[in-house]
Amino acid sequence: MKDRLQELKQRTKEIELSRDSHVSTTETEEQGVFLQQAVIYEREPVAERHLHEIQKLQESINNLADNVQKFGQQQKSLVASMRRFSLLKRESTVTKEVKIQAEYINRSLNDLVKEVKKSEVENGPSSVVTRILKSQHAAMFCHFQQIMFIYNDTIAAKQEKCKTFILRQLEVAGKEMSEEDVNDMLHQGKWEVFNESLLTEINITKAQLSEIEQRHKELVNLENQIKDLRDLFIQLSLLVEEQGESINNIEMTVNSTKEYVNNTKEKFGLAVKYKKRNPCRVLCCWCCPCCSSK
């Protein structure tokens, strides 16, 4: 019998060399494919102008929050005594500033919505600039909405204080009136309380009359402020309805992306598992046809 041990050893070495060469070639090919599928970051246009406008708008919202807080602190000092003209003048200045700032911020937020739609058309809804503008608008809009709610609650509380003070002063003077009567007089503008005939009839002092008149003026100013706030809240409600669908779409996109990533991870795991079980990658015998052919 012919001794073929040396031939077997030589054949085994050739198979090992062929297998190592095949593995290195496969890894190189896989690495090449992976590099082609690597994440390539988009070159987004520079958004310096948008960032500058957003920063400016954020500063305006912060200033509005400071003025609303200042207005609320002034209302805490509301007492039954006669208020000085300087305090009333200062309060009137603050309310005017709040109104001007709120209208400016509302217009700026509307302009930002237009910029978002423009960016969606030019750069696409998934571009970096579009996503930055959307997130910034949502954050600033919520902040602005909270500030206006606080301002509205402060005005409503002040209105109730003024009505309570007028009722108390009339009660002290001997003129009993219900809160509904005061509300009707306020809405209808029939303030016969301030006539000289009533002053003589109930023996009300001029100081008390002056105080009631002052509260009446404050109530009238509050009515005008509430009307302005109502217009702003109507515009805010329209913005909420318009942006609500966009927020829902963003949430659905994020959830679908999360599910897609999880599915991709599972597929990669299965791919690695099947790769290890590939019969062409494992040598069962040195004379395997698939290996010898290579």
UniProtKB/Swiss-Prot annotation:
The answer to whether UniProt assigns keyword Cytoplasm to this entry is yes
The lineage's top-level taxon is: Eukaryota
Q: Which InterPro entries does the record cross-reference, listed alphabetically? A: SNARE (IPR010989), Syntaxin (IPR045242), Syntaxin/epimorphin_CS (IPR006012), Syntaxin_N (IPR006011), T_SNARE_dom (IPR000727)
Q: How does it sit in the membrane?
A: Peripheral membrane protein
Start and end residues of each t-SNARE coiled-coil homology domain: 209-271
**GO terms (BP aspect):** intracellular protein transport; synaptic vesicle fusion to presynaptic active zone membrane; vesicle docking
Pfam families given in the database record: Syntaxin
GO molecular function terms listed in the Swiss-Prot or TrEMBL record: SNAP receptor activity; SNARE binding
Indicate where this protein resides in the cell.
Cell membrane; Cytoplasm
Q: Does the keyword Mitochondrion apply?
A: no
Q: Which UniProt keywords apply?
A: Cell membrane, Coiled coil, Cytoplasm, Membrane, Transport
> Per the record, GO CC terms?
presynaptic active zone membrane; SNARE complex; synaptic vesicle
The UniProt similarity line reads: Belongs to the syntaxin family.
Function statement: Plays a role in endosomal trafficking of the epidermal growth factor receptor (EGFR).
**Complex formation:** Interacts with EGFR.
What is the name of the protein in this document?
A: Syntaxin-19
Q: Which organism is it from?
A: Pongo abelii
Q: What is the lineage of its organism?
A: Eukaryota, Metazoa, Chordata, Craniata, Vertebrata
